[in-house]
Amino acid sequence: MGFHDVKRSKSAKDTRIIAIINQKGGVGKSTTAVNLAAALGEQGRKTLIVDFDPQGNSTSGFGIEKEDLEHCIYDALLNDVPAESLVLDTNCKKVFVIPATIQLAGAEIELVSAIARETRLKDLLEPIQDEFDFIFIDCPPSLGLLTINALTAADSVLIPIQCEYYALEGVTKLLESMKMVKSRLNKGLDTYGVLMTMYDSRTSLSNQVVEEVQSYFGDKAFKTLIPRTVKISEAPSFGEPVITYAPQNKGAKAYMNLAKEVIKRA
């Protein structure tokens, strides 16, 4: 079944295009992209993930073998392959992905001399975006041209922050980049929400980070906290989200609650 055959939610509003972004690695960007998309699919929202990270974790997170792919997002960015032909079905209902492979790493350099280099992603998503309730762009852990493309294509950002020392380190730099893109390339760019990941209620550090983030971001901080669980870490090696791998796990339940908050803000 092609993605055209799957219907959007009956209560659908405009498509939301959300860049999941934090230039720090290991904060749960791809984990959030995969599990939030799966949770939204379970709640009837047709969702697309654009894997924009050369590591391709959002691609392998659905059990897609990157070695078997003929094309990936790189080909749409630089070889004019239409995005429509890159959309793959996943093992989760109503969830689709445009995959990434390590080939995407070369795009940073190749985009430098490209015409309309900042708007490549925006332009290639335009013909298909109305097909979906939500589109998530899983950004690379850097603030280069790929990330600028993501910020130009998105209407808002979701920032995952790990509950650890120096949690807010680097966020200031990210907000500066957003401000620059907003003033020059994408006037409507906004913060959709800030998500705290790898939360451990037993440690005072986790609770301290939650307080810091909530006081810094106010009501932009999601109420749902994503716990640190073995099942969340384990699920990608089985090629599926924790939502389907261990639906009763507290991590899966947290992502289902997060999806409700995301729908409410749409």
Listing of model-derived features with the role each one plays in the protein:
Residues 1-266:
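P-loop NTP-binding core
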